[in-house]
Swiss-Prot record:
GO terms for biological process: response to hydrogen peroxide. This is Hydroxylamine reductase. It comes from Escherichia coli O7:K1 (strain IAI39 / ExPEC). [2Fe-2S] cluster binds at C3, C6, C18, C25. Binds 1 [2Fe-2S] cluster. The gene is hcp. It is an enzyme of class 1 (oxidoreductase).
Length: 550
């Protein structure tokens, strides 16, 4: 086992990465190794997808499957080894079908890629795990060095984050052939184990630029189906009655659940990155979408154990449900998996609803505590002139984009301290689950404009980028000249690709934490600092002083 893709990876003087019987996320060595095997199979599939496009062959089954299966290897998504192997077998079957299509056009069609003809050696998981050793990401570290390995992983993990967003967009009916062609090209190239530093750096920026397009179509999918988010108050306390909790990012699953629970007497609560759903008109119209439950994903083993109803996980993040003994009432959807947990293959939630009706639910309603969400792209753009007016009248000094992933590391309290230290004449724009560090606190307003503005899920960084570009255009300056600072927390691969997106767009002087990614060497961090001004957090006082004086 070798996995260094998330923020909580093991770090020792000898090197970084989880390489024992189990990773810090709870992933076993078996599952981790089989995920490496799956990635190799997907690289072979992409190699043939690239070749097929040369013949004008576009296989939509391949295009929809490849990013979805890659998403299953993202942190805290799928811990179920047999399902990972199932994805690998499906990848190989799709590859062979695509290969046959190519050979039907050109009998001499071939692909020069080491993954292009990969076959699984056995049905036995142990044998497959031994085969997977051939594809361990750091297998040639001694030959290529830590810097090349780090850049490879930056590209691989960044592309994995983009694949997750591609799947979210695809679920909502969004497809862009140019994006899929670019995805396959990059995925196939990474399967050749590239070792050119400049080419890898260029690839990382290409991934960032591609992901900006992905976030654009995801935004289009969400807003076309569910309307543009508008500021909405959400209760974060319990309401009496039977209940279901839904977590993850998939708004379509939430919509289907709301439709199927309507009139059943079962209330629905959002958790984690589902919180922004309350801002969408077509979702909040359901009166039994009563509120948001819990805090950051890392607290779920305590909070889920206390929730008196079933739980549905639609995407990341799931962690071991046996610890809180709620594994008999947690359900997984789509690419999510945990051994022994019931999985919903389709969009029928009747079994979940039946379980909710058999459980006690919340016995009484707590005193409401309301927070505000729903500052989506359209709302943010509508406030652009107000922001400029406040800046011109010196009522608004600075905007801090304070967002990203949450996690268990104690140093993450930095983000709470930073938020509460932001001066009263400054505004906090937040997104993603890192907001749970401070989103239930009171921040007041500046002439009626809330000082805490929740822009949505992690992918809604797109809205923040569009706002920044709009402000820069209206002020006749560059984005880096705005009174705007980005202080980002990271945990997994979606955050990595958001960072690559920002860097590829030329955004500079981003501050990240709580630690640097374990796969980035001191040399690589120095390069990113020199090129983009990217740096790690220090202390709240020092960072605040520096950012306000920039």
């Amino acid at each position: 086992m070798f996995c260094v893709q998330c923020e909580q990876t093991i770090r020792t003087p000898a090197g970084n990465g989880c390489s024992y019987a189990q990773g810090m996320c709870g992933k076993t060595a078996e599952t981790s190794d089989l995920q490496d095997l799956l990635i190799a199979a997907l690289q072979g599939l992409s190699a043939w997808a690239v070749k097929a496009r040369e013949y004008g062959i576009i296989n939509h089954d391949v295009d929809s499957f490849a990013p979805r299966a890659f998403f299953s290897t993202l942190t805290n998504v799928n811990f179920d080894s047999p399902r990972i192997v199932g994805y690998a077998r499906e990848a190989i079957a799709l590859r062979e079908a695509l290969k046959a299509q190519c050979l039907a056009v050109d009998a001499n069609a071939r692909v020069d890629n080491p993954m292009a003809d990969l076959q699984l050696v056995s049905d036995d998981l142990g044998e497959l795990q031994r085969q997977a050793a051939e594809f361990t990401p750091n297998k040639d570290k001694a030959a290529i060095g830590e810097n090349i390995l780090g850049l490879r992983l930056l590209c691989l993990y960044g592309l994995k984050g983009a694949a997750a967003y591609m799947e979210h967009a695809h679920v909502l009916g969004q497809y862009d052939n140019d994006i899929y062609a670019q995805y396959h090209k990059i995925m196939a190239w990474l399967g050749t184990w590239p070792a050119d530093m400049n080419a890898l750096l260029e690839c990382s920026m290409e991934i960032g630029q591609m992901n900006f397009k992905v976030m654009s179509i995801l935004d289009a999918g969400e807003t076309s189906k569910y309307g543009h988010p508008t500021p909405t108050q959400v209760n974060v306390k319990a309401t009496a009655g039977k209940c279901i909790l839904i977590s993850g990012h998939d708004l379509k699953d939430l919509y289907n659940l709301l439709e199927q629970t309507e009139g059943t007497g079962v209330n629905v609560y959002t958790h984690g990155e589902m919180l922004p759903a309350h801002g969408y008109p077509e979702l909040r119209k359901f009166k039994h979408l009563v509120g948001n439950y819990g805090s950051g994903w890392q607290n779920q083993q305590v909070e889920f154990a206390r929730f008196p109803g079933p739980i549905v996980m639609t995407s990341n993040c799931i962690i071991d449900p046996t610890v809180g003994a709620y594994d008999d009432r947690i359900w997984t959807r789509s690419i999510v998996g945990w051994p022994g947990v019931r999985h919903l293959d389709g969009e029928d939630f009747s079994a979940v609803i039946a379980q909710a009706q058999q459980m006690a639910g919340f016995p009484y309603s707590e005193i409401p505590h309301l927070i505000t969400v729903g500052f989506g792209r359209q709302t943010l753009l509508g406030a652009a002139d107000t922001l400029i007016d406040l800046v011109s009248r010196e009522k608004l000094r600075h905007i801090f984009l304070l967002g990203g992933c949450d996690g268990a590391r104690g140093e993450r309290h930095y983000f709470t301290d930073f938020a509460t230290s932001v001066p009263d004449d400054c505004l906090i724009l937040t997104l993603a689950c890192g907001k749970y560090r401070f989103n239930k606190l009171e921040f007041g307003d500046i002439e009626g404009l809330p000082r805490l503005v929740d822009a949505g899920q992690c992918n809604d960084a797109y809205s923040a980028i569009i706002l920044a570009v709009t402000l820069a255009e209206k002020l006749g300056c560059g984005v880096n000249d705005l009174p705007l600072s980005l202080v980002l927390s990271w945990f997994e691969q979606k955050a990595i690709v958001i960072l690559l997106t920002l860097l590829s767009l030329g955004v500079k002087n981003i501050v990240t934490g709580p630690t640097a990614p374990g796969f980035l060497t001191p040399d690589l961090l120095a390069v990113l600092n020199e090129k983009f001004g990217l740096r790690s957090i220090t202390t709240v006082e020092e960072d605040m002083k520096q950012l306000l004086s920039a």
